[in-house]
Structures are given as structure tokens and as C-alpha cells.
């Protein structure tokens, strides 16, 4: 149970994010121009979306509850980021980023 919770966060959620990023990019009107600009950050994140859809849809189904919790948590963080940008809270945004950057000390 704990294992399923953890892999929902560190393995399954990144796949959801990657598929979402690529799908939202492909919906852009000038997607070809955008993709020509794609560099390391996008390519690294988009690489995961090249994974086998059958396999990953089965994994998502198997770990549905934990994955939904992870998605909710991610959406909350995304809203926090969105609000800081919208309200021009640049110092708070920088602190929020620094908090995430601390991961490099763990990994």
C-alpha cells in the first residue's frame, strides 16, 4: 500500500504530467513552430510521453486511487504557482522554487 502510494507520486504522476504537457502543446495552432523551439527542458519531459500507452493506461488503472491523490496534490501546487505569477508575487515564487530545488540535496 505504501509502495503504491510512493510510485503513484514518483513514477505514475510524471507520466500523467508528460502526456498532459505534450497533448497541450500539440493543441497549439502553430505546434510545428513550437516544437522547432523545443530544447532540453521540453524534450526531457516529453520523452516520457513516448512510453507505451497500453502499459501505462493499465498501470494508471491498477493504481487509480493513489494516482488521483497525486494528481490532486500536483494540481494544488500548480495553482499555487499560477496564483503567484498572476499576482506578481515574485519573491514568494522564488521561495517556492527554492523549496523544490532542495530535492537536489536528497537525490
Predicted segments, located by residue:
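N-terminal glycine-rich phosphate-binding loop for ADP-containing cofactors
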Residues: 17-32, 59
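Generic alpha-helical structural context detector
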Residues: 8-11, 15-22, 43, 47
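Conserved Rossmann-fold dehydrogenase catalytic segment
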Residues: 1-13, 32-35
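Amphipathic alpha-helical coiled-coil segments
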Residues: 106-107
Amino acid at each position: 500500500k505504501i509502495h503504491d502510494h510512493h510510485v503513484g507520486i514518483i513514477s505514475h504522476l510524471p507520466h500523467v504530467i508528460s502526456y498532459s504537457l505534450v497533448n497541450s502543446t500539440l493543441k497549439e495552432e502553430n505546434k510545428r513552430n513550437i516544437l522547432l523551439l523545443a530544447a532540453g527542458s521540453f524534450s526531457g519531459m516529453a520523452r516520457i510521453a513516448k512510453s507505451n500507452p497500453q502499459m501505462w493506461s493499465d498501470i494508471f488503472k491498477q493504481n487509480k486511487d493513489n494516482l488521483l491523490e497525486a494528481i490532486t496534490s500536483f494540481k494544488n501546487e500548480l495553482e499555487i504557482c499560477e496564483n503567484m505569477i498572476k499576482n506578481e508575487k515574485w519573491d514568494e515564487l522564488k521561495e517556492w522554487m527554492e523549496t523544490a530545488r532542495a530535492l537536489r540535496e536528497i537525490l
